[in-house]
């Protein structure tokens, strides 16, 4: 493990032309201190997590000391927000400090959120507050623990600097780590400002650093100089195809775990299919497909059940921005593959949650009838699947079924519809080759528990951690970090974090304010 000063920076993005961003020096926070560090993320960077406690670390990531090797940059991008194009976007409260290169040649962006004003801050103060920073810190750990691609947060730092929001709050910084911070909006910016040469340059950059397998062999690269324009376009079509696939896989993951992003603007969409920008996000408590986690989303544009279609809308916006590089007919053909990838990945995830190995056509009926059941009974989505993970094939037999149904008593107001669905589920399980044997069924249940988490970041838990942190107690942040980093494990000492939310906990309203 390395010390902070031993990290190797290779800042490729800052070497791009100045139209891609503006060099900015972070503005200092007063009396900074460490709130929490994520050891898993530190390990990704080959950084000793104990470094986070040093004054060098704390000062370097709160604008009080320049970190050697970094080249702070506010990235310029635009995007569609709630369906409307906004040309005045960019890093308004954060800076790309640089890119850390590990011993395995993995490259990680280091981004400082809450670093102060930039040319893209508009009327904002460029700051982040402790409240929203805690949510992103824990939210990214939760998605990563669930096996869904996301940005990461290395550490969270607090200060005595006061920031004006609905009330005066403590300023904070979050050290965000990601494979890339490139958004759909980066390409939209270059397209709508008619910088087509730079658009091609950015596409080439993305392919070189993140999709190198799309590149041809060295000899074929030399032949590119004489290739026809249409031949040259093929690699950009392959790039868009990859982005469509990654986005579809991401949305399948979100829908399977009940995650609602809340503000799926194109400037919040990662070209690498990462969960990006944790604002008013939320996880389903009771299963409600119409769930709106952002109280500013009056029309429900970004409701939970709208996420698959919105992702395609966003991909269409990206595809349009790439038309200087890809024929429109090719863009349309690539976009048409989205639903197939989404359905394939989502169905696979749902079969895993139900302990089904074989793919059968009637599975869609089993899925839809289950969702109708959960919605009609307002059943807790996560607790249902976790409980189901302890129900063996034998438990579903005629003689054992009544006892099995009792395990769901706390989740259902009426168990008759549940009994009907469980009988259909038992029939479906009978088609699985290994459930007839005890060992095979035990293995199935073990696998189910690896796909049905015991712990998710419920809004009320995040709020409790925030309330304690604002009083100077960061214990709950670290406790939640522990269970969310491995949410499929039992963590018996933290059973209370797996409970159904209290009534007030289901009614929390989350805004974009950060």
From Swiss-Prot:
Instruction: Output the InterPro entries linked to this UniProt entry.
Output: SelO (IPR003846)
Output the lineage of the source organism: Bacteria, Pseudomonadati, Pseudomonadota, Gammaproteobacteria, Vibrionales
Q: Which residues form a coiled coil?
A: none
Q: Where does ATP bind?
A: 90, 92-93, 113, 125-126, 176, 183, 277
Organism of provenance: Photobacterium profundum (strain SS9)
What protein is this chain from? Protein nucleotidyltransferase YdiU
Q: Name one Pfam family in it.
A: SelO
Please name the catalytic residues of this protein: 267
Keyword Magnesium listed? The answer is: yes
Q: What class of enzyme is it?
A: transferase
User: What keywords does the record list, in alphabetical order?
Assistant: ATP-binding, Magnesium, Manganese, Metal-binding, Nucleotide-binding, Nucleotidyltransferase, Transferase
Spell out the reaction equation it catalyses.
L-seryl-[protein] + ATP = 3-O-(5'-adenylyl)-L-seryl-[protein] + diphosphate; L-threonyl-[protein] + ATP = 3-O-(5'-adenylyl)-L-threonyl-[protein] + diphosphate; L-tyrosyl-[protein] + ATP = O-(5'-adenylyl)-L-tyrosyl-[protein] + diphosphate; L-histidyl-[protein] + UTP = N(tele)-(5'-uridylyl)-L-histidyl-[protein] + diphosphate
The positions annotated for binding Mg(2+) are 268, 277
Enzyme Commission number(s): 2.7.7.-, 2.7.7.108
Family of the protein in this entry: Belongs to the SELO family.
Biological role: Nucleotidyltransferase involved in the post-translational modification of proteins. It can catalyze the addition of adenosine monophosphate (AMP) or uridine monophosphate (UMP) to a protein, resulting in modifications known as AMPylation and UMPylation.
Q: Report if keyword Protein biosynthesis is assigned.
A: no
Task: Name the needed cofactors.
Answer: Mg(2+); Mn(2+)
A molecular function annotated in GO for this UniProt entry is: AMPylase activity
């Amino acid at each position: 493990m390395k010390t902070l000063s031993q990290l190797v920076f290779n800042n490729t993005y800052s070497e791009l032309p100045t139209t891609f961003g503006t060099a900015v020096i972070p503005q200092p926070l007063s009396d900074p201190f460490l709130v929490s560090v994520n050891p898993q993320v530190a390990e990704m960077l080959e950084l000793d997590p104990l470094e986070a406690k040093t004054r060098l670390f704390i000062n370097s990531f709160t604008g009080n000391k320049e970190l050697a090797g970094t080249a702070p940059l506010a990235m310029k991008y635009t995007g569609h927000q709630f369906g409307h194009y906004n040309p005045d976007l960019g890093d308004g409260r954060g800076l790309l400090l640089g890119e850390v290169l590990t011993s395995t040649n993995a490259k990680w962006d280091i981004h400082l959120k809450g670093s102060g004003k930039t040319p893209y801050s508009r009327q904002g103060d460029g700051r982040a507050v402790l409240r929203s920073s805690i949510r992103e810190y824990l939210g990214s750990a939760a998605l990563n623990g669930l096996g869904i691609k996301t940005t990461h947060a290395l550490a969270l730092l607090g200060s005595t600097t006061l920031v004006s929001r609905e009330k005066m709050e403590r300023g904070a910084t979050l050290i965000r780590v990601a494979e890339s911070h490139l958004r759909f909006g980066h390409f939209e910016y270059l397209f709508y400002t008619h910088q087509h040469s730079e658009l091609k340059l950015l596409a080439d950059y993305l392919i070189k650093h993140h999709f190198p397998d799309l590149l041809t062999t060295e000899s074929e690269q030399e032949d590119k100089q004489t290739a026809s324009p249409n031949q040259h376009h093929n690699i950009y079509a392959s790039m868009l195809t990859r982005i469509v696939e990654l986005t579809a896989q991401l949305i399948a993951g979100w829908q399977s775990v009940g995650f609602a992003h809340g503000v799926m603007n194109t400037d919040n969409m990662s070209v690498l299919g990462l969960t990006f920008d944790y604002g008013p996000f939320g996880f389903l408590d009771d299963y409600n497909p119409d769930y709106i986690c952002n109280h500013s989303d009056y029309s429900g544009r970004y409701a939970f059940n709208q996420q698959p279609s919105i992702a395609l809308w966003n991909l269409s916006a990206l595809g349009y921005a790439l038309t200087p590089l890809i024929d429109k007919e090719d863009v349309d053909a690539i976009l048409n593959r989205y639903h197939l990838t989404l359905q394939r990945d989502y169905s696979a995830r749902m079969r895993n949650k139900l302990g089904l190995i074989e793919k059968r056509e009637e599975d869609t009926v089993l899925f839809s009838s289950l969702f109708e059941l959960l919605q009609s009974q307002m059943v807790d989505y996560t607790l249902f699947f976790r409980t189901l993970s302890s129900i063996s094939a034998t438990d579903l037999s005629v003689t054992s079924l009544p006892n099995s149904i009792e395990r769901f008593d706390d989740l259902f107001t009426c168990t008759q519809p549940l009994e009907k669905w469980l009988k259909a589920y038992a029939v479906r399980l009978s088609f699985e080759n290994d459930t007839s044997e005890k060992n095979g069924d035990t293995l199935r249940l073990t696998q189910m528990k690896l796909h049905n988490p015991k712990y998710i970041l419920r809004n009320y838990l995040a709020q409790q951690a925030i309330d304690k942190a604002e009083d100077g107690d960061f214990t709950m942040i670290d406790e939640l970090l522990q269970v969310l980093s491995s949410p499929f494990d039992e963590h018996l000492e933290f059973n209370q974090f797996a409970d159904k939310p209290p009534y007030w906990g289901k009614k929390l309203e989350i805004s974009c304010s950060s």
